[in-house]
A protein has these predicted regions:
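Family-specific signature for flavin-dependent thymidylate synthase
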Residues: 1-355
Length: 355
């Protein structure tokens, strides 16, 4: 077994290729195939997902396009008015007779409007798909990352219980590590089950207790049978739990013991009861480590942080507070550190935007 701590990192992209790479990462996270990512691998991977109907992954690829209303194709106008898009209008001095629109959306909206257009964008050899957009009367623009409609993605490692809460915020796009297809008994790939430390197991206490646990493990003869060895480890954790009077230490030892038992039950279900991984997962508890990719507009991120960090509508769980604080801290860094690209309120526009 392995123990990890919650961690959240914000990803974002200012060009199409970067967004396609984010979508690939989100898709591969689900089945833990990130090791297969290589230059250009997103093309084959995303087209495969489209063929299988898994188009939700395309939501993690942000799309930022702009142009005059009277030059936009009907597809671009429909994309602009999608419930999953946001837009801002402007009046340009060069053409005061036509509104100029900045559209903030994602590749799934494009796919739902025109599947062939989305596939062409995935396969484009340019950074932003300039010629493809130009044919539809729009051009790519680079948003300011502090704009309310810029899209931000969080790569979150946390407890399964926190993931279960976050997926209820459906205004966000999410991709979650699968427990159905991840075989945690396959030692060549996963080594073992990973657990994410809850808020009530303090780092310093856990480190000291786990160090003592490992010291006692080294003192016993290693059992070659995987499950019997896990039972030996559980005996050690139980003895440490029973013989310690400090409540913080007892919590740590009890937590270690529970994680060992969870791994025992999972492996017994697999190895002795002949259950496939998708059925043995029923033995996994809500403390297992789970990864998710979580994408949304800045404005929606602020709303979720208000609810899940600042308890706007009721107190959120402390484990949720940890994850949301990490997201907020990194969002603040990205929003304030991006260098001004232009003096525009929206960012940098392609030279062809007003053609």
């Amino acid at each position: 077994m392995k123990f990890v701590r919650p961690v959240s990192v914000i990803h974002t992209a200012h060009n199409l290729k970067g967004g396609l790479q984010l979508a690939e990462f989100a898709g591969r996270l689900c089945y833990k195939s990130e090791g297969k990512i290589e230059p250009g691998s997103y093309v084959k991977f995303l087209l495969m997902l489209i063929d299988k109907g898994h188009t939700s992954i395309l939501e993690h690829c942000p799309i930022y396009i702009c142009g005059y209303h009277d030059m936009m194709s009907i597809e671009m106008i429909n994309i602009r008015h999608s419930a999953f898009s946001r837009f801002v209008s402007d009046i340009k001095y060069a053409r005061p007779d036509s509104h100029f629109y900045y559209i903030y959306t994602n590749l799934r909206v494009v796919y739902n409007e025109n599947p062939e257009l989305a596939k062409a964008l995935i396969q484009t050899s340019t950074m932003e798909g300039d010629e493809i957009w130009k044919a539809h009367g729009v051009a790519w623009f680079v948003p300011k990352f502090d704009h309310p409609f810029a899209r931000m993605s969080a790569y979150i490692t946390t407890l399964r219980s926190v993931v279960d809460e976050l997926v209820r915020e459906r205004v966000q796009s999410d991709a979650v590590e699968s427990t159905r297809w991840c075989d945690y008994s396959n030692e060549g790939r996963f080594d073992s089950i990973s657990f994410c430390l809850p808020h009530w197991v303090k780092d310093s206490t856990f480190n000291a207790c786990f160090k003592r646990f490992l010291k006692d493990v080294e003192a016993i003869e290693k059992n070659e049978d995987k499950i019997q060895r896990l039972y030996d480890l559980e005996d050690i954790a139980f003895c440490l739990y029973q013989n310690d009077i400090n409540i913080a230490n007892k919590r740590a030892y009890h937590y270690i013991r529970c994680c060992i038992m969870d791994e025992i039950f999972y492996n017994e279900a697999k190895d002795e009861l002949d259950l496939p991984a998708q059925d043995a997962r029923e033995y996994l508890f809500l403390g297992i480590k789970s990864e998710m990719y979580y994408t949304g507009f800045n404005k929606e991120w602020d709303n979720i942080i208000d609810k899940r960090l600042y308890d706007k509508y009721g107190k959120a769980h402390p484990n949720m507070h940890i994850t949301m604080q990490q997201c907020k801290d990194h969002l603040d860094v990205i929003r304030t550190s991006q260098k001004a690209i232009t003096d525009s309120d929206h960012g940098g526009e392609s030279e062809s935007a007003g053609d």
